[in-house]
């Protein structure tokens, strides 16, 4: 699932902006979150970039993260970047993305239900989330 997410977000800056909020840290590996955060920083650092290039992004991310990560973590990150660059989406790719979005909505609904239980919200908010 991690490579599906990276593939989708690497397609365009718009895709990253559109889908990043649905990708929760507990759903994907730590390296995936590092890469996604790096993509966001990459686009902010180079606003004129319109087409994502794995090679230049990899160099940017490794340079940026080398100050923060251990050697072992850098090796894991490099492996993840290499696999992400070579990833070819499979027939279930779209389903993976739908599942991520569904998981996010379910989490939001559960949080709102907790608020209803505590008395700080009402069922109208749950209904709005469930029907959007």
Language-model regions, residue ranges each:
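Noncatalytic partner-interaction/assembly domains of nucleic-acid and motor enzyme complexes
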Residues: 1-103
């Amino acid at each position: 699932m991690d490579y599906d997410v990276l593939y989708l977000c690497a397609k365009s800056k718009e895709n990253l902006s559109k889908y990043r909020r649905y990708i929760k840290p507990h759903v994907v590996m730590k390296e995936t979150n590092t890469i996604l955060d790096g993509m966001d920083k990459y686009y902010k650092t180079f606003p004129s970039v319109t087409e994502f290039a794995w090679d230049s992004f990899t160099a940017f991310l490794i340079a940026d993260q080398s100050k923060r990560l251990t050697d072992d973590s850098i090796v894991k990150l490099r492996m993840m970047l290499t696999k992400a660059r070579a990833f070819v989406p499979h027939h279930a790719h779209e389903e993976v993305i739908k599942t991520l979005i569904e998981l996010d909505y379910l989490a939001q609904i559960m949080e709102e239900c907790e608020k209803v239980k505590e008395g700080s919200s009402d069922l109208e908010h749950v209904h709005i989330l469930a029907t959007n």
